[in-house]
């Protein structure tokens, strides 16, 4: 609302629409919770100072008054089961094969959604099964570069997507990169609803990769700490605690 420059002009539907947009973009529960708390603090302060009348409707009603449910920052290391991920992709592929391909990239490489849509042919080394991300060029979080090692079983897939990128002047595998993430998110929501699968958003596919990477490392002889740290590095983190908190549930770990 660029036309709104004064706090007294902020309406409840604006506040609710802003929070709903954060939800649609799959922002973290912690961030959404902080935004909601800030809006309610603003509401209280404006009533105390007389900017809002005492009888004015709340900027952001609580759930008991018909508002949005609360959000918290506690991470959940819950992924789609491999068969769930495949069902979602199969549902989407018939109506939006491009979105389905993005999800396949996330599932098989662990890339974040923006990293996936900005992936280029020149980032993929099929012979070594390594994807090299160059920070801002690949839209990595914080602009940090990293390498992701992919299972040799995925060589046919890597060859396929690399060939797609090689047909484009920039090497990018996907077009419409600015709008594509939101499109993919919407398709995932529709698929999960239709298939009655608990929706974990697009990030659930990254978690599916993380769970499989941890399992592969354990099967290759790594201990729990080594497998956790390797998975964190693959995902673009540098602490095993991140994997423990957000990616690999306790029941799937070897302690």
Regions inferred by a protein language model and the residue ranges of each:
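C-terminal catalytic core of tyrosine-transesterase DNA break-rejoin enzymes
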Residues: 104, 208-239
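Basic, Lys/Arg- and aromatic-enriched nucleic-acid-binding interface segment
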Residues: 82-113
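DNA breakage-rejoining catalytic core of tyrosine-based enzymes
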Residues: 67-87, 140-152, 169
């Amino acid at each position: 609302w660029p036309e709104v420059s004064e706090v007294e002009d902020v309406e409840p539907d604006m506040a609710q629409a802003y929070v709903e947009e954060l939800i649609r973009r799959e922002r973290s529960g912690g961030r959404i919770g902080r935004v909601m708390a800030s809006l309610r603090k603003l509401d209280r302060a404006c009533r105390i100072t007389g900017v809002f009348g005492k009888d004015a409707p709340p900027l952001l009603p609580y759930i008991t008054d018909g508002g949005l449910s609360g959000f918290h920052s506690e991470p959940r290391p819950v992924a789609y089961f491999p068969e769930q991920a495949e069902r979602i992709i199969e549902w989407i592929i018939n109506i939006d094969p491009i979105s389905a391909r993005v999800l396949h990239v996330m599932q098989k490489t662990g890339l974040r959604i923006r990293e996936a849509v900005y992936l280029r042919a020149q980032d993929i080394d099929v012979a070594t099964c390594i994807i090299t991300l160059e920070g801002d060029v690949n839209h990595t979080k914080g602009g940090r570069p990293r390498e992701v090692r992919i299972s040799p079983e995925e060589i046919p897939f890597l060859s396929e997507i690399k060939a797609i990128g090689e047909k484009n002047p920039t090497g990018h595998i996907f077009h419409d990169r600015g709008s594509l993430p939101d499109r993919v998110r919407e398709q995932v929501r529709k698929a999960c609803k239709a298939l009655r699968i608990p929706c974990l958003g697009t990030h659930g596919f990254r978690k599916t990769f993380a769970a499989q990477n941890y399992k592969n490392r354990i099967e290759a002889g790594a201990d729990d700490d080594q497998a956790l740290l390797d998975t964190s590095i693959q995902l673009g983190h540098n602490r095993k605690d991140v994997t423990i908190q957000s990616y690999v549930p306790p029941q799937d770990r070897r302690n």
